[in-house]
């Protein structure tokens, strides 16, 4: 897994308040460099085809990606994460708390 940073426009930095208390975040983004799509894909590390909706392929009909990332830190308008699977400069559409383990569980 890759560590990386998500840079938020400075005018949205205030909206990050409290994010640092979380263990993980969900990032919704746009596959802006993906061209076209196929309903059947062969995912990396697999030998067989499957339907696009049964995969994490970036070549999707709607070009929307969603990743759950481990939150490392928040400093100003920079979010440091682990598990990054986006290209540099990928447009981030939204950031939400990961509530799969319970709503607003504290880091511990």
Spans of model-derived segments:
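Glycine-rich, low-complexity intrinsically disordered segments
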Residues: 1-108
């Amino acid at each position: 897994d890759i560590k990386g940073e998500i840079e938020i426009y400075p005018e949205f930095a205030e909206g990050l308040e409290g994010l640092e208390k979380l263990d993980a975040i969900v990032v919704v983004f746009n596959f802006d460099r993906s061209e076209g799509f196929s309903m059947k894909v062969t995912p990396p590390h697999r030998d067989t085809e499957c339907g696009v909706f049964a995969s994490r392929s970036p070549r999707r009909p709607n070009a929307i990606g969603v990743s759950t990332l481990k939150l490392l830190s928040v400093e100003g308008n920079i979010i440091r994460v682990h598990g990054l699977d986006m290209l540099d400069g990928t447009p981030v559409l939204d950031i939400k708390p990961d509530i799969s383990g319970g709503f607003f569980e504290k880091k511990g």
